[in-house]
Amino acid sequence: MDTERIGVGKIIGTHGIRGEVKVFPLTDFPERFRPGTRLILEQEGADGREGRTFPVTVISVRPGKGNLILKLAEINDADQAGAVRGATLKVEPWEVEPLPEGHYYIYQLLGSRVYTTGGEFLGILRDILATGANDVYVVRNEDAGEILIPALKTVVRQVDLARKEIRVELPPGLRD
């Protein structure tokens, strides 16, 4: 199992004088921020210095304009809130919300080796683009370059998280 923490929100600013923070959610599960929830705040250090990491507890949450406004128990004023701007709120991998069968988190798929159903190696899944209709897998291969693969059930035939492998059946003309 992955041991790297999973980002669920990005602190993008402060709100008011009582230490509330504006959070851009990185999750499709807003209940992740319900009062009483424990999260891990990770802040990168500047100029190569080590950043800060500490646990925080959500006291309250309410909707903002395109974001959420959170009050965290450990942040008590606007100065403290400003000091954590840019930090990421994370959870441990075993704390992620379970998904229905056949659905995956982006972090689970990135880095997977992608093959055709015939066994041809296409490359490594490096990015996933959200296009509205369906996601698109960005697969890169040092020799063949980049290929964009629609993330459709008719195309993505098998995902093996344990082996970090994805099998696809490319639509005709995709590589022409």
From Swiss-Prot:
Q: Which SUPFAM superfamilies match?
A: PRC-barrel domain, Translation proteins
Query: Where does the record place the PRC barrel domain?
Result: 101-174
According to its UniProt record, where is this protein mainly located? Answer: cytoplasm
Tagged with keyword Chaperone: yes
Recorded hits in InterPro entries, A to Z, give: PRC_barrel-like_sf, PRC_RimM, RimM, RimM_N, RimM_N_sf, Transl_B-barrel_sf
Keywords, A to Z, come to:
Chaperone, Cytoplasm, Ribosome biogenesis, rRNA processing
Query: Which one of the record's GO molecular function terms can you name?
Result: ribosome binding
> Record keywords: Cytoplasm included?
yes
- Note the superkingdom of the native organism: Bacteria
Localization terms from the record? Cytoplasm
Gene Ontology terms: biological process: ribosomal small subunit biogenesis; rRNA processing
GO cellular component terms, A-Z = cytoplasm; ribosome
Q: How does it assemble?
A: Binds ribosomal protein uS19.
Q: What is known of its domains?
A: The PRC barrel domain binds ribosomal protein uS19.
Q: Which HAMAP family match?
A: Ribosome_mat_RimM (MF_00014)
**Protein name, as recorded:** Ribosome maturation factor RimM
Species of the source:
Moorella thermoacetica (strain ATCC 39073 / JCM 9320)
